[in-house]
Amino acid sequence: MSIAFRESELVSILGQSGCGKTTLLNIIGGLDQYTSGDLIINGQSTKQYKSADWDIYRNHSVGFIFQSYNLIPHQSVLSNVELALTLSGVSKAERRRRAKEALEKVGLGNQLNKRPNQMSGGQMQRVAIARALVNDPDILLADEPTGALDSETSIQIMELVKEIAKDRLVIMVTHNPELAEKYSTRIVKLLDGQIVGDSDPFDPAKEPAHSEVKKTEVTKGQKTSMSFLTALSLSKNNLMTKKGRTFLTSFAGSIGIIGIALILSLSNGVQEYINSVERSTLASFPVSIQHELSLIHI
């Protein structure tokens, strides 16, 4: 297929299950690699992209919204959104500021310290949207963002997505044609991996994009990595929220180790005792060996 997107529009991808909607989304987001053809980003081919280049592209230029939210249950709402910035080398104070702004933008500025299990499905999806926006990506990819929500909450989420699409490209996979017709500026229909309908096709040659600075080029040299201290802090928080299970696991492991040590010690002691009995018994009944020479006359 061949398709191009404008810098700011809300594109809905429609089609039956298995027609390639999610695969298309994953290729655009750099999650899957194409086997033929090319993915051109801001006029630049990605054929020569290495793993580090894809990491930079995913981390700085693309935001992902999934149907299942993918929030970390033991982290607060604010920490979940901040986590998207940990790979960008952003300072803690800056992470906190940007995360708060993103949550306020989606209407959750007064629920920063709640846990995901204390929120409704619509609120968790708003947290996921805030997490996708906190890096200020050029492209927002949404895979069934309203699939697990009721109709009223779906409308609220779509209103939010429509507002976001005013200053960036939003590509959404959905099975809901009614929502797509109402909120999208463009609808693309797929069938067996091919485009069979496009309500507002875009030709870059006839309608060139007007962008002074390309974020992909600006962030080309930036390194994406998580510091050891950050990873240690996340692990510690995970353990602290599961104290009971951690204690029981440690206790059971300790019993197992102690049991193995006792068995080995007992086995070694029994073997040593048997050897000692053998030595003392043989010492009480010495065995003498005599050598006799017999002469045979023929």
Where are these regions (language model features)?
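The feature captures the beta-strand-to-loop junction immediately N-terminal to the Walker
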Residues: 14-16
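Helix-to-loop junction immediately C-terminal to a conserved catalytic motif
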Residues: 29
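Conserved ABC ATPase signature
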Residues: 115-125
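Conserved catalytic motifs of ABC-family nucleotide-binding domains
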Residues: 136
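Catalytic Walker B motif of ABC-type/P-loop ATPase nucleotide-binding domains
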Residues: 140-143
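Alpha-helical transmembrane segments
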Residues: 245, 258-288
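Conserved small/polar residues in nucleotide/adenosyl-binding loops
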Residues: 297-298
